[in-house]
Amino acid sequence: MEQGDKQATYNELETEQPVSKEGADSQPEDEAIGAASEHADAQAGENPEAASTTADPAEQTSVEAEELAKAKAQVAELEEKLAEMEKRYLRLYADFENFRRRARQEMEAAEKYRAQSLASDLLPVLDNFERALKIETENEQAKSILQGVEMVYRSLLDALRKEGVEVIEAVGKPFDPHLHQAVMQTDEGGYEPNTVVEELQKGYKLKDRILRPAMVKVSQ
């Protein structure tokens, strides 16, 4: 009985179909293809924008055009701001140059006319000296005093000349309202019309600036 069972089992093993080599080799390949497909689907799910870009070139071109337009708008805005800043810089530079020029002119004028205040204060003193020197006397002591007065007067004039103070020429010159102040008119002959015929008070100028115009009589 036991021997019959063994024979039956042996027959069953012989009747089983063997697994083909081709089927065994194709199973791993199918599994690899399936895994690659699942991986591609997963990447497409994680990056739908890339998938859509690959799938739709027209949409990608539209996005690039929009980005380019934005970049151009930003460049135009920056160029406009740069131009405005350049204008502001030029205005500030011009204002600064004007300030420097005015400051330089003021400094030069202050140096050039530094004696103006003192000279103006001394003009009445010069007038008094001139009046004193016009006095005529036969007294020797008075003449000696007048000689001393004249020396002081000349020294004072020399000091003022060194600072640029000059006497304005008047008699015989054409009347100039910038240099002369007409206080009288005369019909005296021998002079061209509108000519200074007499100086009543001397005028002075400091370089090219008038300290005091000369008071004169003018022919008609």
UniProtKB/Swiss-Prot annotation:
Organism: Geobacillus thermodenitrificans (strain NG80-2)
Principal place of residence: cytoplasm
One cellular-component annotation, GO: cytoplasm
Signal peptide coordinates: none
UniProt protein name: Protein GrpE
Keyword vocabulary terms for this entry: Chaperone, Cytoplasm, Stress response
Keyword Transferase: no
Polar residues: bias regions: 1-12, 50-63
Subunit note: Homodimer.
Function per UniProt: Participates actively in the response to hyperosmotic and heat shock by preventing the aggregation of stress-denatured proteins, in association with DnaK and GrpE. It is the nucleotide exchange factor for DnaK and may function as a thermosensor. Unfolded proteins bind initially to DnaJ; upon interaction with the DnaJ-bound protein, DnaK hydrolyzes its bound ATP, resulting in the formation of a stable complex. GrpE releases ADP from DnaK; ATP binding to DnaK triggers the release of the substrate protein, thus completing the reaction cycle.
Biological processes annotated in GO: protein folding
Stored Pfam families: GrpE
Record-linked PANTHER family: GRPE PROTEIN, GRPE PROTEIN HOMOLOG, MITOCHONDRIAL
Region (Disordered): 1-67
